[in-house]
Amino acid sequence: PSERGLDADGMLAAAARGDLGALVVGGVDVRDFADPDAVRAAIAAAPFVVSLEVRSSEVTRLADVVLPVAPPIEKNGTFINWEGRLRPFGQAVSARSLTDRDVLVRLAEEFGADLGITALSDLYAEANPLMDWEGAREAFAPVGAPPVPGVGEGQAVLAAHKPMLDA
């Protein structure tokens, strides 16, 4: 592309304004954003929402169409954790489920677009050069944690990250 696209916040803001015709959302938890209520409102405001997901979620409940995708145990791939570290994983179970990549490629083909992706190696070839970036990085506003509730005598608070944060 000749122009920079929108980041997640930009896409959600555009959806909330009615500037997008549709949203395709994959594996997003609204609680990962600084303002989950704004994310819910933006998704609800989008005229058409497609969700690619392995389980029921707030997004799937708001979606017009939910397309199931293979969970990590049924495909090869790589997670990029919040620190930007690559965490590759292999397929543990043989299944016939479609991967996120397969579903996205088929959706694009239906709309007459060629993503240029025929194999997982195509994604690696495009993404790997980005991992070695040494230039300036985007500045992100810090997001504080919610206050820890008070605890009384003999009580405890369990504070844990979501599963697979560091997968």
Describe the function of each predicted region.
Residues 1-96, 103-110, 121-167:
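A cross-kingdom feature strongest in bacterial/archaeal respiratory oxidoreductases
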Residues 111-115:
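Short, hydrophobic alpha-helical segments
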